[in-house]
UniProtKB/Swiss-Prot annotation:
This is Elongation factor P. The lineage of its organism: Bacteria, Pseudomonadati, Pseudomonadota, Alphaproteobacteria, Sphingomonadales. It comes from Sphingopyxis alaskensis (strain DSM 13593 / LMG 18877 / RB2256) (Sphingomonas alaskensis). The gene is efp. GO terms for biological process: peptide biosynthetic process. The keyword Iron-sulfur does not apply. Keywords: Cytoplasm, Elongation factor, Protein biosynthesis. Coiled coil: none annotated.
Length: 187
């Protein structure tokens, strides 16, 4: 579907100059002379390059719709991750760079959603929150109040998070995958 330069919004996936780009930021600019334009920042979903481009109202770009499919994470193999299609049981191998830093939160058997463009994986969506066990937590410092102080802890997947003082090693907690913050104790 073609859209004009002024219809571009953050989060849109567009095809431009032979690449697939996810729009991260836009700014509408109306200079004193000349026509208005949209200043667009975008990230290439294939190789991670950044784009900074001006689109005038007369310019058109192709808005891309990605297909989504349910997969299950199986295991890591070096710098690659192996997923299984939940419908066909077919396995697919994807580089860790496609998942980004969130790959540290992948757990065997975890259900994820893959975004595909022309049958090629572009990104992986993990659940927003996961459960993990704390393997190491600093001791509580006397005199700290529970309301404002947090202490560092290391999860069973090696990720460091800040947790409240009452949380100790061996405790199962819920962590937000994308901002790496403690949410609550696991039930």
């Amino acid at each position: 579907m073609k859209i004009t330069g002024v219809e571009i919004r953050p989060g849109n996936i567009i095809e431009f100059e032979g690449g697939i780009w996810k729009v991260t930021k836009i700014q509408h600019t109306q200079p004193g002379k000349g026509g208005a334009y949209m200043q667009v920042e975008a990230k290439n979903l294939i190789d991670g390059r950044k784009l900074n481009n001006r689109f005038r109202s007369a310019d058109t770009v192709e808005k891309v719709r990605l297909d989504t499919k349910d997969f299950q994470y199986l295991y890591a193999e070096g710098d690659d991750l192996v997923f299984m299609d939940k419908d066909t049981y077919e396995q697919i191998t994807i580089g860790k760079d496609v998942v980004g830093e969130a790959h540290e939160f992948l757990q065997d058997g975890m259900d994820v959603v893959l975004e595909l463009w022309e049958e090629r994986p572009i990104s992986v969506e993990l659940p927003e929150q996961i459960e993990a066990t704390i393997v190491e937590a600093d001791a509580v410092v006397k005199g700290q109040t529970a309301s404002s102080s947090y202490k560092p802890a290391i999860l069973d997947n090696g990720v460091r998070v800040m947790v409240p003082p009452h949380i100790t090693s061996g405790t199962r907690i819920v962590v937000n995958v994308y901002d790496r913050e403690y949410v609550r104790r696991a039930d």
